[in-house]
Amino acid sequence: YEPHTVSSDRNDHLSPEFLSLNPNNKIPALIDPQGPGGKPLPLFESNAIPIYLADKSGQFLPTEPARRYQTIQWLMFQTGGTGPMFGQLGFFHKFAGKDWEDKRPRDRYAQESRRLLGVLDRHLEGKAWMMGDDYTIADIAIFPGINTLTTYYNAGDLVGYEDFGNVRRVFEAFSARPAFQRALNIPDRNG
């Protein structure tokens, strides 16, 4: 793959080229020049892309129907749960909302984020990954959000992150993966 920087400061996400990939003008977007039938396939949405890539590569998404749908279930948990809740918490904790006198919005998202971490923590009891021993696109979708919550938004204390031993354990294993370490440096921040 070839990563491309899309800068909101330069309004790259509003360019005709980017909008042809993602009419919702948000990252991520992907174009597979060798899509189905050998034709280019543009895709957008954080969890549509990994389903496509997993299907294309034959990796990270079980083929057995029940396990496949359970994996997709956890992908949707990220789409409708941890993704938006952690993002809203980040807005109210770190960005514009941090200066608002009324802390109810921040506290509401912190409470819901904590609840979702509890769901994950209970699910991960006795498991290496979201789907047991199988590393899947559910892990690839969920655990970068844990990183964003705790390091970028600095909201670990606010949600009581230390209380979720199973989440911490699996996140540590996820963080040690070479692919995650490479992803932290996209775009190249060393040169």
Locate predicted features.
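Exported/periplasmic ABC-transporter solute-binding proteins
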Residues: 182-187
